[in-house]
Amino acid sequence: MLVLNCSTKLLILEKMLKSCFPESLKVYGAVMNINRGNPFQKEVVLDSWPDFKAVITRRQREAETDNLDHYTNAYAVFYKDVRAYRQLLEECDVFNWDQVFQIQGLQSELYDVSKAVANSKQLNIKLTSFKAVHFSPVSSLPDTSFLKGPSPRLTYLSVANADLLNRTWSRGGNEQCLRYIANLISCFPSVCVRDEKGNPVSWSITDQFATMCHGYTLPEHRRKGYSRLVALTLARKLQSRGFPSQGNVLDDNTASISLLKSLHAEFLPCRFHRLILTPATFSGLPHL
């Protein structure tokens, strides 16, 4: 195991990962954030350098952590040789097996290999698989012709809005998610539409892997074109900063899939896999 701390080498790694799209997108997004101030306190672990076969991004060991916060305790994985990834999994100090955590990636063997090692350590593992999408370059000029009604007030979220997002996110509703969302809003780009009272009615945020997520419109404000406006604006904002505009969508989320198709988003050949690993000590907790 090698922790890559050199800023020059991290920039080189970023370029190397770009040549491995789309499977490397999650790790690439995390490395881009590391190279641009590292607001989420991440670090990179590899099997070797420069001819690596597996690379993992994780929370810095010195960063404050909550053992129940799998949102923040998230690892992104990319490998050229799955055996190298398994070897890193089996090393004692790459993953923190005493806490609830996530593993994210875009490669098909990720679940089976992770499950085999997790089972040997008596951890429960839960898989959720998504369609992975990528936005083509978005015009710098916003098109609002599709909006229905008055032009909305388009702005960004504040930490004060974290509670609303926590309550409306299917993955949320708990203290850990509330804190995580507040950190995402503080660290990364977001977009929202606000009503005449200044309250958010439609929004999307960016996560620690530079992925667009939690796109949501309050039910009473749907069918006005807000979701489309928010998605295009956030994609444009990410692209203007040099980030790929990527996202994930569940197979049964037909409304979001239809929206993405109307935006000409590219559905990638690989799928996004999110694994949540839970030690037996915490297995009875309801929000996990």
From Swiss-Prot:
Catalytic activity: an acyl-CoA + glycine = an N-acylglycine + CoA + H(+); (9Z)-octadecenoyl-CoA + glycine = N-(9Z-octadecenoyl)glycine + CoA + H(+); hexadecanoyl-CoA + glycine = N-hexadecanoylglycine + CoA + H(+)
GO molecular function terms attached to this record: glycine N-acyltransferase activity
Keywords: Acyltransferase, Lipid metabolism, Transferase
Similarity annotation: Belongs to the glycine N-acyltransferase family.
Matching Gene3D superfamilies: 3.40.630.30
GO biological process, alphabetically ordered: lipid metabolic process
Annotated GO CC locations: mitochondrion
Name under which the protein is recorded: Glycine N-acyltransferase-like protein 3
UniProt-listed InterPro entries: Acyl_CoA_acyltransferase, Glycine_N-acyltransferase, Glycine_N-acyltransferase_C, Glycine_N-acyltransferase_N
Pfam families on file: Gly_acyl_tr_C, Gly_acyl_tr_N
Native species: Homo sapiens
E.C. numbers: 2.3.1.13
Broad class of enzyme this protein falls into: transferase
Protein task: Catalyzes the conjugation of long-chain fatty acyl-CoA thioester and glycine to produce long-chain N-(fatty acyl)glycine, an intermediate in the primary fatty acid amide biosynthetic pathway.
Pathway annotation from the record: Lipid metabolism
